[in-house]
Amino acid sequence: VARNTLQRLFQKPIEWVIAVKLERYYTKEEILSMYLNKFDFLNNAVGIKTAAHTYFACEPKDLKIEEAATLVGMCKNPSLYNPVRFNERSRGRRNVVLEQMRKAGYITDAECDSLQALPLKLKYNRVDHKEGLATYFREYLRGVMTAPKPVKSDYRGWQMQKFYEDSIAWETNPLYGWCAKNKKKDGTNYNIYTDGLKIYTTINSRMQQYAEDAVKEHLGDYLQPVFFKEKEGSKNAPYARSLPEKRVEELLTKAMKQTDRYRLMKEAGASEQQIRKAFDTPEEMTVFSWKGDKDTIMTPMDSIRYYKSFLRTGFMSMDPVSGHVKAYVGGPNYVYFQYDMAMVGRRQVGSTIKPYLYTLAMENGFSPCDQTRHVEQTLIDENGTPWTPRNANNKRYGEMVTLKWGLANSDNWISAYLMGKLNPYNLVRLIHSFGVRNKAIDPVVSLCLGPCEISVGEMVSAYTAFANKGIRVAPLFVTRIEDSDGNVLSTFAPQMEEVISISSAYKMLVMLRAVINEGIGGRVRRYGITADMGGKTGTTNDNSDAWFMGFTPSLVSGCWVGGDERDIHFGRMTYGQGAAAALPIWALYMKKVYDDPTLGYDQQEKFKLPEGFDPCAGSETPDGEVIEEGGLDDLFN
């Protein structure tokens, strides 16, 4: 844009040359079409199609004459003739366009007079990335595509993990930083807002809707009211009753200092006392509720406590072979809870880590049929201190049990037994090989119980190896990108890696199916899920994190549910454990998917194991006999 007369003088001849070239290659209709498809009609409406939806809630072909004239009138100066802000001014401009149409013979005198007499009526529906379907996914995709090349000096000391992850993504993920890596013909970077790019994502709109509906049904309609009721009358609410009041006040004050209101008041020179007084003064505000936004009066400090009371969630579903991400939910509502718990946030994974431990065991010669005595296990930790994990399962105490039984029942003593036979460093290496980027996973003996933090997306990607013969596939969010003319600019293929042997993968499949059919994951069957599947629940200390990972031959999906902070949680496992808080979301989603025949998913689909495959081959029974033939049914029935 020319900023002064001299620049304008130089710009004019260039425009003349461009105009002549355009006229040579395109008709006037084509030129107008290209112009309207790129014009910014304000209010996030770039292009005539988006503008028609934004201002009149219809397709361009369905615009009435006076509506089309309104949009054309905006082209002279969209800010000056903005129909939302300046209705009468925009109406006047519309009538000028109608008059020009009359002069050109597109409408009759009578039509012109009648149309000019009409009021300007809008069906305004602003396009907002914070609303609609797949909001967390859209924002995640925007951040990935517009990411700049990582420069270490741009990251603070506590952001070195992020710098590490961003650097890997820049080098290995062609979608990461796409706008910075790809140039237009004029040498400038692409702009995802104004260049009319067509981005073809892997998200299935119906499956996405089913995922969001499942979250609302379980989290919004059932679990959240139960949580509110549990916290009624507690001075600490929403924090745990056992937490000292002083600690609760510290946490709320910390949250206050992270708000924009606090930052702006601080920048304006307000004292801590003045800021606190403002935060303790009631005011009108609109707040989130699962039944819709509600107007209320409360202090900003109370609003912080109010929003802390809402349980958060992360959910992702993907194809284990193609890597196509079908559904992506990062939280309850993007407008009010913008931190993405699908791909960005990490939480302790609890017992969902145990399949990695058992995989390491299978890779080191163990089999699902190997047995050990079900008793307490004591290991020496990294500090030379004895460590004995607690166990919620005292069934079959003192008996010989199989590893398959141990995983199916998520037994901590059996996990500790395996950890004693293996090496924590090797377990960390294996977890990283499954695509987990968190460098802060400590090689300690307690790692077998899942104290490390991993994202839902990383977990879902990792579990694809169990459904895909030992091959892990990275999440694929976009298949191709085209320019505004339909020219393909980039295509994206699945990124796959064999992380474990096919034999170990089959053995893990056998055990993870047993979690559902014989163990603690059986609750999923109550939802009408009869499919051949494997899975694993997870619950961390004090019910701070609830997990469920489940997979069928065609879909791998994972769900996490928890509070905004670890000290915000259910007091009872009845509601806070993975099988109660996270598993139902997975099950509700899958039931909706299976009930939609147009999606093509069938509960009759089975995992395919090689003919004659014996997961017990090479295993030793208590009397030392080596099992060479027969399968699990021979041993466990």
Label every PLM stretch briefly:
Residues 201, 205-221, 252-319, 324, ...:
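A penicillin-recognizing enzyme superfamily signal
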Residues 13-17, 26-29, 34-36, 43, ...:
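Extracytoplasmic
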Residues 1-170, 179, 186, 333, ...:
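Peptidoglycan glycan-strand catalytic modules in the bacterial/periplasmic cell-wall system
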Residues 15, 19, 23, 75-93, ...:
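Active-site loop and adjoining helix of the penicillin-binding protein/serine DD-peptidase-beta-lactamase fold
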